[in-house]
């Protein structure tokens, strides 16, 4: 079940990257999050186990008029999706919450048609 959801999340991320940002499905998205100070901060929060706080911060700071924020959000959820289920559970987060957050972000940016069930 969780492996299936992991693959679904990754497929959604790749679809949004391809359509919204013109990035091919084979290109890695990690460079944006690693190159920005904001992305590094989110990544450190994930590594420190502050996943809920990192997601809250992202939602609060997000600028829907700037597609670079979509890239940062996609990178954030991709990084979370690569975490183990045990790590997520240890920090009160779940793969289902990754799925929900990703769908919410896509809806905010008008790409909900790419991630609908």
What are these model-predicted stretches?
Residues 2, 40, 44, 63:
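Short, charged/polar micro-motifs that form catalytic or ligand-binding hotspots
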Residues 9, 16, 51, 57-58, ...:
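Inward-facing hydrophobic residues that define packing positions of alpha-helical scaffold repeats
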Residues 17-38, 56-88:
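Short, charge-rich amphipathic alpha-helical segments embedded
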């Amino acid at each position: 079940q969780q492996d299936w959801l992991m693959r679904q999340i990754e497929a959604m991320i790749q679809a949004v990257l391809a359509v919204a940002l013109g990035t091919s499905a084979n290109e890695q998205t990690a460079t944006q999050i690693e190159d920005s100070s904001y992305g590094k901060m989110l990544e450190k929060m994930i590594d420190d186990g502050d996943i809920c706080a990192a997601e809250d911060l992202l939602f609060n700071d997000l600028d829907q008029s700037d597609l670079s924020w979509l890239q940062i959000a996609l990178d954030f959820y991709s990084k979370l999706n690569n975490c183990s289920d045990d790590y997520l559970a240890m920090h009160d987060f779940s793969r289902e919450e990754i799925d929900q957050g990703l769908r919410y972000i896509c809806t905010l940016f008008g790409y909900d048609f790419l991630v609908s069930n």
